[in-house]
């Protein structure tokens, strides 16, 4: 007898998506307004030059800012940022500055000056939005080229994650406000 049970299709993505939850930051130079949102779906898509994909619904203010200004930040929150991550992913920033609302301190990115977060977080990237593709319209997927990146030296060692301290670990959203952290490193061979 099989131990497998049917999964409702609206939960099927959760079977694959246990990668790190990220915070997407954006800034409108004209109005001087900034925004931050949580996103469960992001991934690298090219090594050279480094390029990434993020999924941001076209109805969001974040998407408007990114498409208007052509740039965005990706912040990788740590366990200590769980409450921030859930909060900024649960409300729109169209009518309020979520950085101020939740007391999230900001650092400025070195290339675009994007709002980024280091406190309670493990890494960040500044990205330039790549020209629109059909995936952008059909699937809400935006592609960006990474122009600057930094990571906490306690957890990113010699080009890879090293999660020896449970408090310095990435968050992985399982849905409905439930998160897990990364496991222990296992080496093949």
UniProtKB/Swiss-Prot annotation:
Cited InterPro entries: Flavin_Rdtase-like_dom, Flavoredoxin, Split_barrel_FMN-bd
Transmembrane segments: none
One MF annotation (Gene Ontology) recorded for this entry: oxidoreductase activity, acting on the CH-NH group of donors, NAD or NADP as acceptor
Keyword Flavoprotein: yes
Keywords linked to the UniProt accession: Flavoprotein, FMN
Cofactor(s) of this protein: FMN
Domain of life where this protein originates: Bacteria
Pfam families the record matches: Flavin_Reduct
Keyword DNA repair attached: no
Family of this protein: Belongs to the flavoredoxin family.
Name recorded for this polypeptide: Uncharacterized protein YddH
Organism: Escherichia coli (strain K12)
Encoding gene (name): yddH
């Amino acid at each position: 007898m099989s131990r497998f049970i049917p999964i409702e299709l609206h939960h099927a993505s959760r079977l694959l998506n246990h990668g790190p939850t990220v915070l997407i930051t954006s800034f409108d130079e004209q109005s001087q307004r900034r925004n931050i949102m949580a996103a469960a779906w992001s991934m690298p898509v090219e090594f050279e030059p480094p390029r990434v994909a993020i999924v941001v619904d076209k109805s969001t203010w974040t998407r408007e800012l990114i498409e208007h200004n052509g740039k965005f930040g990706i912040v990788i929150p740590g366990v200590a940022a769980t409450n921030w991550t859930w909060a900024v992913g649960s409300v729109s920033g169209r009518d309020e500055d979520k950085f101020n609302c939740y007391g999230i301190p900001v650092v400025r990115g070195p290339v675009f000056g994007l709002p980024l977060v280091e406190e309670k977080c493990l890494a960040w990237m500044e990205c330039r939005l790549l020209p629109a593709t059909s995936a952008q319209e059909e699937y809400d997927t935006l592609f960006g080229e990474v122009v600057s990146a930094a990571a906490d030296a306690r957890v990113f060692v010699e080009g890879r994650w090293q999660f020896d301290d449970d408090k310095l670990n990435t968050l992985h959203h399982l849905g409905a406000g439930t998160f897990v952290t990364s496991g222990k490193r296992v080496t093949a061979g």
